[in-house]
């Protein structure tokens, strides 16, 4: 399977630069995966396509201010992106500029408050051992910036708009963007209608947004990301599967959690790291539906969606979305695949 099989034409002006004023007023393209039938709607009308008993599973991760700016001890500015926490003091990070970020280099972000030393090089970045005074999360909130994807050029006025309204557990370098469309009112309306909700956790890191560089996609190696599924969520998913009710993932991160822990059509409580790479031919055990945004050409996310709905159907839907000027990527419009 070739990387070019997942390419499509996207005019740059369709890449959404800012969130809409109201989260649930984004457009919704509904794709029926059996027939390829497409319906166009607005996200706040999601209820029309659900039935009482459907289980929506969301990712409760929260984006951290993962961009830090500092200087090397020897001089010269440096920027890092926190990607994965290794232990209490050590993080895997991306460093810019990378060519002078050698093992042993000391970095100063706020003198006496937050400093670090590069202690190792990894396949994708560096390991930094931080020294700090106080609580790391509080220091990060003071010094760090919310990381936005590189295709978003405009400054975000309200960082909360890059968080889902149910974000709880800090740890992500990027938002699980399918959830950005939900409002408290919409969730209440769906619950009143009989739709159930469950929460899992996946801290979004490089595994989600690392570009594919190999022409043969099977040679791509996913970066691992931390996940948790607790007992309550596992029980809700298993009950829905036993009773023949639909399990609908809100976002590709939820798909990867549920399918990582799937065993014979059931899930068990678990925590750990997943590097699950889902591409066409994958055997889905848990999910029956997917809410997701429109993804970058040649991305692992587009491959996952293609695995679930069929590559031709997905690329046809994308072509129609481009023609109808849907908004793409993180702050863009949504798809519901059922």
From Swiss-Prot:
Q: Which domain of life is it from?
A: Bacteria
What is the protein's species of origin?
Carboxydothermus hydrogenoformans (strain ATCC BAA-161 / DSM 6008 / Z-2901)
Oligomeric and partner information: Monomer.
Where is this protein localized, as stated in its record? Cytoplasm
| Catalysed reaction, written as an equation | 7-aminomethyl-7-carbaguanosine(34) in tRNA + S-adenosyl-L-methionine = epoxyqueuosine(34) in tRNA + adenine + L-methionine + 2 H(+)
Give one Pfam family, short name only: Queuosine_synth
GO CC: one term?
Answer: cytoplasm
Q: Which residues cross the membrane?
A: none
Q: GO BP, one example?
A: queuosine biosynthetic process
Instruction: Name the SUPFAM superfamilies on file.
Output: QueA-like
Coiled-coil ranges from the UniProt annotation: none
* Name of the protein in its database record: S-adenosylmethionine:tRNA ribosyltransferase-isomerase
Q: What GO molecular function annotation could you give as one example from this UniProt entry?
A: S-adenosylmethionine:tRNA ribosyltransferase-isomerase activity
Q: Tell me, what does this protein do in biology?
A: Transfers and isomerizes the ribose moiety from AdoMet to the 7-aminomethyl group of 7-deazaguanine (preQ1-tRNA) to give epoxyqueuosine (oQ-tRNA).
Look at the named UniProt entry and state the broad enzyme category this protein falls under. Answer: transferase
